[in-house]
């Protein structure tokens, strides 16, 4: 089978996406891809999601932080951004999604926008809401365990013990 001439080949753009959730969230590539496709179908329909493509090429998620590289056709980057804005949960875990940048090649996308593994997490006991509570510290973010579930905080909200 012959290759298509260059002017007939599909042109792609690659979005680097940052992911953030609670430290105990377990999100894998398959679940993220499924939620992305469902969100695209719900927002722009079957024909629009087929034109968009939205394939996850690179995925890493651990300890509540992660990143992904998602492929879209050249004219569909804004539609993919809109679809990503509608993602709020994956497998029942809340998820924050931030588009770090757009590039024309996978290599440039990974070199410019994908940072690799974040610094490690640390478990500490902190003073929060008038009591000592267990917490997970990641860079400048703190996740405090309360009886109703985890609560996000910053270094200004807590006091180390």
From Swiss-Prot:
Q: Which InterPro entries match?
A: Pop5/Rpp14/Rnp2-like, Rnp2-like_sf
Presence of keyword rRNA-binding: no
The terms describing its cellular component in GO are: cytoplasm; ribonuclease P complex
- Taxonomy, superkingdom: Archaea
One of its GO biological process terms is:
tRNA 5'-leader removal
Catalysed reaction, written as an equation? Endonucleolytic cleavage of RNA, removing 5'-extranucleotides from tRNA precursor
Q: Does the keyword Zinc apply?
A: no
* Location (main, coarse): cytoplasm
Its keywords, alphabetically, are: Cytoplasm, Endonuclease, Hydrolase, Nuclease, tRNA processing
Recorded GO MF terms: ribonuclease P activity
EC numbers on record: 3.1.26.5
Subcellular localization is given as:
Cytoplasm
Describe its assembly. Consists of a catalytic RNA component and at least 4-5 protein subunits.
Function, in words: Part of ribonuclease P, a protein complex that generates mature tRNA molecules by cleaving their 5'-ends.
Q: What family classification does the UniProt entry report for this protein?
A: Belongs to the eukaryotic/archaeal RNase P protein component 2 family.
The protein's name? Ribonuclease P protein component 2
Originating species:
Natronomonas pharaonis (strain ATCC 35678 / DSM 2160 / CIP 103997 / JCM 8858 / NBRC 14720 / NCIMB 2260 / Gabara)
Gene symbol here is rnp2
């Amino acid at each position: 089978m012959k290759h298509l001439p260059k002017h007939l080949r599909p042109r792609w753009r690659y979005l680097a996406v940052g992911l953030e959730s609670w430290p105990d969230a377990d999100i894998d590539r398959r679940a993220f891809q499924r939620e992305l496709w469902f969100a695209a179908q719900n927002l722009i329909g079957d024909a629009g999601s087929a034109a968009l493509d939205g394939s996850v090429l690179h995925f890493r998620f651990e300890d509540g932080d992660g990143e992904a590289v998602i492929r879209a056709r050249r004219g569909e980057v804004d539609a993919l951004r809109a679809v990503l804005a509608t993602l709020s949960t994956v497998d029942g875990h809340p998820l924050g999604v931030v588009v770090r940048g757009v590039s024309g090649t996978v290599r440039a996308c990974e070199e410019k926008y994908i940072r690799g593994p974040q610094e490690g997490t640390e478990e500490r006991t902190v003073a929060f809401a008038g009591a000592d509570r267990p917490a997970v510290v990641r860079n400048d973010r703190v996740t405090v365990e309360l009886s109703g579930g985890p609560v996000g905080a910053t270094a200004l909200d807590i006091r180390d013990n």
